Amino acid sequence: MLKKLIITAISASLVASAVFADSTNVGFRVSAGNLSASGTENTNLSGTDVTRAEKDANFEMASIFVERQIETSDKFNIIIGLDYVPMTADVATLGGGTGFDAKVSAGNLFTAYVQPTFIVNDTISVFGKVGFASGDLEINNISRQATTAGTASTDAAQDKTLEGTVFGIGAQMNRAAGVFIRLEATQTDFDKIRHTNSNSKVLTADAEMELISLSIGKSF
């Protein structure tokens, strides 16, 4: 339901851009982030959890963005944007001798967002952000070794889609010639992913990403 509301808001903002004066923003973003994940492994489709793993990793990454800025009034703008992160990072790693060790990695993350912005003065503005993120998910390094219980799987690597909602707040400083600098904090809550291997063992992983980002861009 929340995803539908976000998509509806982005679509409505695009329609509104035809009515109000607007401009285009482009730029790049550098982020310091924390990725926390938890996972479980079940013995089979109806079994209880036998393995739990948690991971907390700090990292840095860069992205590029393009935006349409809708100037609704002297004090309020709405920005519709798309951000691309050419990243690959581990989301979860589950280990053990039960025949279903696996590494879960995410990459090529796209985020579509709406950014309502309140203009404090000619130099400073503050904003909130809500969006939807989607990326590639790879499940690889799946254990296929023989075990005493005969529980080894015969799986190959799997590709899935990683999706989640994004929320954030930030501030922007406007400079000369349309250049701006932003500082923002965002949180992405990814949907739980689920994978069942060839002998009915079930892997689930839940991930959350927090970013502190510095952006430099230009308006045209």
Locations of the language-model features?
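Gram-negative outer-membrane beta-barrel domains
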Residues: 2, 18-220
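Sec-dependent signal peptide recognition
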Residues: 2-8
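Bacterial N-terminal signal peptides
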Residues: 8-14
